[in-house]
Curated annotation (Swiss-Prot):
The lineage of its organism: Bacteria, Bacillati, Bacillota, Bacilli, Bacillales. This is Bifunctional protein FolD. CDD domains: NAD_bind_m-THF_DH_Cyclohyd. The keyword Amino-acid biosynthesis applies. NCBIfam families: PRK10792.1 (NF008058), PRK14186.1 (NF010783). The gene is folD. Belongs to the tetrahydrofolate dehydrogenase/cyclohydrolase family.
Length: 283
């Protein structure tokens, strides 16, 4: 079998068109969804991500503001900027681009953003609501993954899901969201013994470790759905995922490519959360 490609670009495009309509509806009621992004330093990957966020937000008719600071910015100064946006009704979402310089506490920054404007879904209050299955801002990449899985029309209930990776940004929350969909979830990580024994049982395999071509075809169950979250740049300059794509696509039933799989959904779900936050101001 050759796997059906799960087209993240196409799914993101459909979702963005829907969001653009919702933005127009909100504007008609006097609310312009606003996203404020804070970028510290000049890490090329971060600059690229922020550029993508700006383009997406403006294409959907949202207000976008970027505050760029030198990496000498102190933690106290950053927290003051966050406080100003927390109080500013023109902005419904606040995002501080990670990673941060070593002298700034990621925890302090995440906890300073108002839970009502935490469109990344990282604030402990929103993480707690996610664990409880309550309505909240879901983390963007995990939420995007669930949306892509739903496009396959496969019933997630009762499926064996294996998540390789346990980061707070992707691994842990995507497992929780799939548990909320009644899947049976196993986590694998750097201390897991005999990882292949677990991955070969997976009906749905989600890989988010940041290691190029880490998972090979012989670790994948025949007919599995494979979601590859990794984005790695090879010495040749070519981008690849955490899964050996050419091999895996001959074994899986569905697979996400890199690039063009999970990535486009992340920014789309960020826009979704910003629109959701703007809509809340009406109620």
């Amino acid at each position: 079998m050759t796997a059906t490609i799960i087209d993240g670009k196409e799914t993101a495009k459909e979702k963005r068109e829907q969001l653009a309509k919702e933005v127009e509806e909100l504007k008609a009621q006097g609310v312009v969804p606003g996203l404020a992004v804070i970028l510290i330093g000049d890490d090329p990957a971060s600059v690229s991500y922020v550029t993508g966020k700006k383009k997406a937000a403006e294409t959907m008719g949202m207000k976008f503001k970027l505050d760029r600071f030198d990496s000498s910015l102190t933690e106290a100064e950053l927290l003051t900027v966050i406080d100003q946006y927390n109080q500013n009704p023109e902005f419904h979402g606040i995002l501080v681009q990670l990673p941060l310089p070593d002298h700034i506490s990621e925890k302090a920054v995440i906890e300073r953003i108002s839970p009502d404007k935490d469109v990344d879904g990282f604030h402990p209050l929103n993480v707690g609501k996610m664990l409880l299955g309550e309505d909240t801002f879901l983390p963007c990449t995990p939420h995007g993954i669930v949306e892509l899985l739903k496009k396959t029309n496969v019933d997630l209930s009762g499926k064996e899901v294996v998540v390789v990776g346990r980061s707070n940004i992707v691994g842990k929350p995507v497992g929780q969201l799939l548990l909320n969909e009644n899947a049976t979830v196993t986590y694998c990580h750097s201390r897991t013994k005999n990882m292949s024994e677990h991955t070969k049982k997976a009906d749905i395999l989600v890989v988010a470790v940041g290691k190029a071509n880490f998972i090979k075809a012989d670790q994948i169950k025949e007919g599995a759905i494979v979601i590859d979250v990794g984005v790695n740049r090879l010495e040749s300059g070519k981008l690849c995922g955490d899964v050996q794509f050419d091999e895996a696509k001959e074994k899986a039933s569905f697979i996400t490519p890199v690039p063009g799989g999970v990535g486009p959904m992340t920014i789309t779900m960020l826009a979704h959360n910003t629109v959701k936050s703007a809509r809340r101001t009406l109620s």
